[in-house]
């Protein structure tokens, strides 16, 4: 979740049809191959890009409903504890609401400050292009400054012309109003609500506007969705997860039927955790054009998967904590340390700096206390199996220790709780298997893999085609004059025409395909290797790159394409283009 690129450069150059030598090669002058990426979503060149649909709008509205229900029930429960005179429960409940919210609002406001700040001495990040063939224009992201260098005789990338005094005054007033509004929104702890509404607005604008503005608004919508998904992931595991364990522990400790308000708070926290995890994975896949998007069916099944596994996990925690409070704290700290070390040992590559990567790994360690979260590239089947085997053993041990120290007058009640833990975990594993076997974007886990984004069909077996001649050529006898004149050879009737040795198969005439005229836009070469899934691309977590890309995309009449520096071996497809 970094905001800096440590001086990485983004270079805008010509497309594949531009001058020779500019379409291949390394970014930053290192002579290394460049990995191509362009905009959100895999689409064919010349075809319309992904559109914002009604179900996308409904998904955002449901996310807002989950957010408000979680916060409102927690605050309502804290007020109930206060009115009942239970100051300890009131303080703990309010602490788990306010402290994570303050942390997330500070991070969100920091992102806003960077996004809306202007470098000294420049009119802002907005730029314009005279033509679409931009040759040699370099955009540096060092120290948040945007500099432009062009070759002589080429199309020029120029800053926006200086506004008049009246325009400057109006612009400053607008900026002041935006700053005051954002400050008020974040003081009211509504930064995420603002980002949800803005993502909804940008998505609707991308549907209603023309082609060029549609792409621009769609990019902005994806950036805003990525921001709010990261913020929600951080907040839910700092607020909803501890709140869920606390309320369940109090419920088990009292040994009576739950009140309606307590049950609502527990349910809202549980749904918030499951929803945030599924929403994060969906936005992450939607943002990468090298991965197939996650369908809404898969997202709903992911919600059910995490809902039941987290419910079993937190109930086991609550049962154990209701009897062994000190040992429960030791267990949580030990589990967090082991999981954090496991994540660090996997050498994740999510952030732009070392210290931010360490902080991120610590947050992932907190997530691993409750549920599975993929942080490493490649097939995760073994890691998922190992993790849930450990969780199963821990849940059984925690529940067993609590059951051994139970009150024997409530045997039936204790047996019901044990069955709830076991059945909830089994249901969660069932929905996980349904997701991986039927609804995974890459295809069934045990069946054939679905076609990828770059290759529409699965590659066939290596070797020559069926019509190819695999045997080496043999020497043919010389054709005599008699044979050329049609004389029978080997008993055939004279005058019978012989078939030619080589034949050309008649083929259908090529059908002319009407291709829409399109202008090649700038190629933005980023002097960084592209991060591998499940990490975010650098232009999503580095806000300098984001500002530069949005400025070029808005000013260019064609879709800009991004190229990351490739650290691996050369591939057949070094550049591929998608429409935003």
UniProtKB/Swiss-Prot annotation:
Key word Cell membrane present: yes
Keyword annotations of the record: Cell membrane, Membrane, Transmembrane, Transmembrane helix
Listed Low complexity bias regions: 1-22
Highest taxon listed in the record's lineage: Eukaryota
Keyword Cell membrane: yes
GO cellular component, one term: plasma membrane
TM stretches of this protein: 59-79, 89-109, 260-280, 303-323, 326-346, 355-375, 384-404, 415-435
Membrane topology field: Multi-pass membrane protein
Subcellular location: Cell membrane
Stretch list, region Disordered: 1-35, 470-492
Family: Belongs to the XK family.
PANTHER family named in the record: XK-RELATED PROTEIN (PTHR16024), XK-RELATED PROTEIN 7 (PTHR16024:SF7)
Protein name: XK-related protein 7
């Amino acid at each position: 979740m970094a905001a800096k690129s440590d001086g990485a450069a983004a270079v805008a150059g010509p497309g594949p049809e531009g001058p020779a030598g500019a379409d291949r090669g390394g970014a930053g002058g290192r002579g290394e191959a460049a990995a191509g990426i362009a905009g959100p979503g895999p689409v064919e060149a010349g075809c319309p890009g992904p559109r914002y649909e009604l179900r996308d709008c409904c998904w955002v509205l449901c996310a807002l409903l989950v957010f408000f229900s979680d916060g409102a029930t927690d605050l309502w429960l804290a007020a109930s504890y206060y009115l009942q005179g239970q100051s300890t429960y009131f303080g703990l409940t309010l602490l788990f609401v306010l402290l994570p919210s303050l942390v997330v609002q500070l991070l969100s406001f920091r992102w806003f400050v960077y996004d809306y700040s202007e470098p000294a001495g420049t009119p802002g990040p907005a730029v314009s292009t005279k033509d679409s063939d931009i040759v040699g224009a370099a955009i540096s992201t060092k120290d948040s400054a945007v500099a432009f260098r062009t070759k002589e005789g080429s199309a020029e990338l120029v800053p926006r012309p200086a506004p008049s005094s009246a325009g400057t005054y109006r612009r400053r007033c607008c900026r002041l109003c935006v700053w005051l509004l954002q400050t008020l929104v974040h003081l009211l702890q509504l930064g995420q609500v603002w980002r949800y509404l803005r993502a909804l607005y940008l998505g609707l604008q991308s549907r209603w506007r023309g082609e060029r503005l549609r792409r621009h608004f769609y990019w902005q919508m994806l950036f805003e969705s990525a921001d709010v998904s990261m913020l929600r992931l951080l907040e839910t595991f700092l607020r909803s997860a501890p709140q869920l364990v606390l309320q369940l522990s109090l419920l088990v400790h009292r040994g009576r039927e739950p009140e309606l308000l307590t049950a609502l708070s527990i349910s809202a926290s549980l749904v918030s955790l499951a929803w945030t995890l599924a929403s994060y994975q969906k936005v992450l896949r939607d943002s990468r054009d090298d991965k197939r998007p996650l369908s809404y069916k898969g997202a709903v099944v992911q919600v059910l998967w995490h809902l039941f596994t987290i419910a079993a996990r937190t109930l086991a925690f609550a049962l154990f904590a209701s009897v062994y409070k000190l040992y429960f704290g030791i267990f949580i700290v030990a589990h967090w340390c082991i999981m954090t070390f496991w994540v660090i040992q996997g050498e994740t590559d999510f952030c732009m700096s070392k210290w931010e990567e360490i902080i991120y790994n610590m947050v992932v360690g907190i997530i691993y206390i409750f549920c599975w979260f993929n942080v490493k590239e490649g097939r995760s089947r073994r890691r998922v199996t190992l993790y849930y085997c450990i969780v199963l053993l821990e849940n059984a041990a925690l529940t067993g220790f609590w059951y051994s120290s139970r009150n024997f007058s409530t045997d039936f009640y204790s047996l019901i709780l044990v069955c709830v833990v076991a059945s909830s975990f089994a249901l969660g594993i069932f929905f996980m298997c349904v997701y991986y076997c039927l609804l995974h974007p890459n295809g069934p886990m045990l069946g054939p893999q679905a076609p990828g984004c770059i290759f529409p069909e699965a590659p066939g077996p290596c070797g020559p085609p069926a019509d190819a001649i695999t045997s080496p050529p043999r020497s043919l006898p010389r054709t005599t004059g008699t044979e050329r004149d049609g004389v029978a050879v080997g008993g055939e009737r004279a005058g019978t025409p012989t078939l030619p040795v080589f034949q050309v198969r008649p083929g259908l005439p090529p059908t002319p395909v009407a291709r829409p005229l399109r202008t090649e836009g700038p190629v933005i070469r980023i002097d960084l290797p592209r991060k591998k899934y499940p990490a975010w691309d650098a232009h999503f977590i580095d806000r300098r790159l984001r500002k530069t890309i949005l400025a070029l995309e808005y000013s260019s009449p064609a879709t800009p394409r991004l190229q990351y520096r490739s650290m691996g071996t050369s591939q057949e497809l070094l550049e591929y283009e998608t429409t935003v």
